[in-house]
Amino acid sequence: MATPTPDDIANDVQERSNTALKRGLASRHMQMIAIGGAIGTGLFLASGATVANAGPGGALVAYAAIGLMVLLLMQSLGEMSAHQPVAGSFQTFATKFISPSFGFAMGWNYWFNWAVTVAADLVASGLVMAYWFPSVPSWIWAVGFLVIVVGLNALSARVYGEAEFWLAAIKVVIVIVFVLSGVFMIAGVMGENSPGLSNWTIGDAPFHNGFVGVIAVFMIAGFSFQGTELVGVAAGESENPRRDVPRSIRTVFWRIMFFYIGAIAVIGTLLPYTDPSLLSAADDSANNIAQSPFTLVFARMGIGAAAAVMNAVILTSILSAGNSGLYAASRMLHSMALKRQAPAIFARVTKGGVPAYAMAVTTVTAALGFRTQLVFNDAYIWLVNIVGISGIIMWLGIAVSHIRFRRAYLLQGYRLEDLPYRSPFFPAGPIIAFVMCLVVMAGQNYEAVLHGQVWEVASSYIGLPLFGVVWWGYHVARKDRVVPLAEMDVAPVEIEPVTH
């Protein structure tokens, strides 16, 4: 092999400086990114639908089960991310530990998921603002929302992290106040007369619709927890990922579980599952902010401006989701470009370490998705359904990647004691999570399957064959193979020191 010349070395250094992200996320940023990613409109609006569909007991069981699954998956992701803290996170792991074609499909699947999610956030921003300004066209608010999100992402990872820290903090405070106030209401200390536990015994509560009801809630609960993987994506820009990733995995999950389980318990105890407002709150309408279970409970406390307060909180949730969505999508595209799984231009970064071209194409895609909703609503619904199942595919990939990583790590002579963080549940953890992911995926729209509603089934599961086509297409084009255990790159990734 020829010895590199000084010019070769200089060119390599220049190329790395043009494509290298900067580690600017502190420990507090990492923890709030994970929390903020998991607490959003799914909790503030859709949580009521889970109680309506499964009863208070069924909703609690569903969220606890999905929470367990996510815990196992985050343990797996934490082990790999602390060992190899790269921006591509699980997509890089899928490429290294499964096959390049699977990683390729997983990366583009994840990027498209967040690009369309940002588009959905643009739609939601217009709906929320219509609560206060019904006569103003929704596209005006969407443009303003997009400008804010792009501005927060365009400066640096640290600015993004700081914005997400405070946006997530608002949501955390509201949920804590909600849960504690709910406990006081149940105890009869404040608000109207306490219903006690009567709402757990009306009708066929606590398990309305039985096992079928729990399965129906699995998908809602699963979507609610999506976003916790952002801590893995952000590992590539963490100041100290070997410390902060495990810390975030260990502490953040239990906080998220407290928020969800606590909120669902309060909603199911204070509001009967037969209340029609619980279902209508999940519909896409500005008027239904007043039907949010959070709004209903706050109103019972005597807070007259409950709807306006929750509207403001939901707006911050949408901004937080859009902020994180643009961040995650642009980092994923940047990571794939470094592996030549996306056009090389997307690997370029600004002096602040921001992948500007990757961010730009994500922004344009989100804007087009928003435009599609305005003109072709049916097409937009299909887009949303395509990405709806992508989170489950991502989780499946994490489980398989971890199993193969651990096997290769030991086969190649490495010691478990040298891992910065070790999942305490291996090998049962990723196996159980894998099976649960399959159950959640199968139950995505079981009613349509049972009733033979072909169009609904196709709309719900279209993401699966599309993922398969991308996976197989890359496999055929590149003639790749499943990476043998002995050839896997499981060596620890060197971390350059952070300078301020």
Spans of model-derived segments:
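A generic transmembrane alpha-helix motif of multi-pass inner-membrane proteins
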Residues: 185-186, 381-394, 423-500
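Helix-loop-helix junctions that connect adjacent transmembrane segments
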Residues: 12-22, 60, 137, 169-311
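Membrane-helix boundary/coupling elements in multi-pass transport proteins
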Residues: 86, 109-124, 220, 225-238, ...
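TM-loop-TM module centered on a large, flexible mid-protein loop between adjacent transmembrane helices
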Residues: 92, 99, 131, 217, ...
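C-terminal membrane-solvent junction of multi-pass transporters and transport-like membrane proteins
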Residues: 166-167, 346-356, 395-455
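Membrane-interface "cap" regions at the ends of multi-pass membrane proteins
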Residues: 1-48, 52-57, 70-75, 87, ...
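Extracellular loop-to-transmembrane helix junctions
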Residues: 21-22, 46-141, 145, 151, ...
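Membrane-interface loop-to-helix entry segments
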Residues: 126, 139-197, 226, 249-253, ...
